[in-house]
C-alpha cells in the first residue's frame, strides 16, 4: 500500500494521465447522494448497536457529520492514488510472494490516510489492532517515505488515521441494512 501511495504522492500524473479519477471527497459525495449511501450508513450504524461501544453509540447523531468532515478534509491534504476499498477480500499474494490488490472500481485521488485507516480497521481483530496499530503505522510511514512519499511525523499520521476511521466505518455499516433498490 505504501508503494502505491509513495509512487503517486503529489505526482504530476494526478493532473496528467490520471486526471480522469475522481477525488475521494467527490467519489464519497456521489456515492452518498446518488446511491443513498448516507441514510443507509446511519441505519446500519444503528443496527450495529450490539457491537458498537456504548460510549460511541451515544454519539450516533455526531457520526455522519464527523464522517463528512473527515471526507472534506481530503480536499486540503496532499493527494495520491487511493484504492479506497482495501478490505481483506481484495488482497492477494502472488506466486512469488508479492501482495496485490484487486477490485479497483473505487480507485480515486485522495490522502493515503483513507486506505491506511480502512485496511487496519477492517483487517485486524480489535485486540490485535489496538496492540499493533501504532507499530503498523510507523512501518507504513517508513515504507511510504522509502517509496517516494513524505517524511510524515507520527503524530500527524496518527491524526490522519483516526480522522479517516469515520469513512471506514461508514463504508461498512450499510452492509447491515442494504438499500432495497
Q: What positions do the PLM features span?
A:
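Regulatory N- and C-terminal appendages and interdomain linkers associated
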Residues: 15, 57-76, 152-181
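Catalytic-loop signature of eukaryotic-like protein kinases
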Residues: 85, 89-92
Amino acid at each position: 500500500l505504501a508503494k502505491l501511495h509513495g509512487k503517486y504522492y503529489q505526482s504530476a500524473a494526478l493532473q496528467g494521465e490520471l486526471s480522469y479519477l475522481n477525488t475521494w471527497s467527490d467519489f464519497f459525495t456521489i456515492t452518498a447522494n446518488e446511491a443513498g449511501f448516507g441514510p443507509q450508513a446511519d441505519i446500519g450504524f444503528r443496527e450495529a448497536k450490539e457491537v458498537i461501544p456504548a460510549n460511541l453509540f451515544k454519539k450516533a447523531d455526531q457520526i455522519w457529520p464527523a464522517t463528512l468532515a473527515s471526507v472534506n478534509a481530503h480536499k486540503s491534504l496532499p493527494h495520491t492514488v487511493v484504492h479506497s476499498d482495501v478490505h481483506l477480500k481484495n488482497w492477494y499474494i502472488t506466486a512469488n510472494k508479492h501482495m496485490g490488490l484487486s477490485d479497483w472500481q473505487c480507485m480515486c485521488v485522495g490522502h493515503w490516510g483513507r486506505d491506511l485507516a480502512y485496511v487496519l480497521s477492517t483487517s485486524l481483530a480489535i485486540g490485535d489492532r489496538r496492540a499493533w496499530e501504532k507499530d503498523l503505522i510507523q512501518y507504513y510511514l517508513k515504507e511510504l517515505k522509502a517509496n517516494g512519499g513524505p517524511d510524515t511525523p507520527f503524530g500527524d499520521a496518527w491524526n490522519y488515521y483516526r480522522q479517516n476511521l469515520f469513512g471506514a466505518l461508514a463504508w461498512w455499516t450499510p452492509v447491515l441494512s442494504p438499500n432495497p433498490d
